[in-house]
């Protein structure tokens, strides 16, 4: 039995990422960056004399790779938190928007300065809540603005929530933060209408596909019909040719038939003439034979007497 063929592994695949020591590209993955950091740190820890300029370049490369790794980790964490707390922030944004509208109505309906002042304070408070739901940092865990009882509430989370509320309220009072209520409502309604738009887009794409399919089939169908019409025309031409040939055959065969008929008529006339001649001969013979019989009968009578 022949020995199994040994598989050869080669390093012919394309390298991904930078091959140089210095500088870190943005497109590198986190695993490759961390591996590069470990390799460079291992080189720096070797008890081998190294040029000072090269050591500085390696240290700068390590620092650049670490910054890039931190950015990638932060982006991944932000995306994770956005996806995780997306629904709760959406509902709390809607609730804060309703409260802002109610507070603004109170300001318009206030019949005294004291009530108007209290209503304006409520507007600022609820605007801060709306800013809280919009501008809450994504790199930390989202703390619910309206906690569900004592289950979600802790002393630390309550303290952090009130701190961020106060910061947003201060920024709104100083004009440093502008919260657009219409934009917040648009963001809230966008998610509701997203499915409708996607459904409409699917129907439009389906209609376009049907139109494309019809346009693709139409030339083929027209071509098939054209071929069928050509075949029908060819069949009609063949039938006409057959009819013409039949007429020619009938014309060609008509002359012999007429000759046969003419000979038959001539033969019949000859037979009729011969029959008439025989009849005449017989009649003459009868007329000649009658007097003789009468004479014979008279002679017999005389003898008997």
From Swiss-Prot:
Residues 205-214, 225-254, 272-286, 294-305 have a biased composition (Acidic residues). Residues 1-28, 185-305 are annotated as: Disordered. Residues 51-121 form a coiled coil. One of its GO terms (cellular component) is nucleolus. It comes from the Eukaryota. Residues 215-224, 258-271 have a biased composition (Basic and acidic residues). Keywords: Coiled coil, Nucleus, rRNA processing. Pfam families: Efg1. The keyword Coiled coil applies. One of its GO terms (biological process) is maturation of SSU-rRNA from tricistronic rRNA transcript (SSU-rRNA, 5.8S rRNA, LSU-rRNA). It is found in: Nucleus, Nucleolus. InterPro entries: Efg1 (IPR019310), EFG1_rRNA-proc (IPR050786). Involved in rRNA processing. Belongs to the EFG1 family. This is rRNA-processing protein EFG1. The lineage of its organism: Eukaryota, Fungi, Dikarya, Ascomycota, Saccharomycotina.
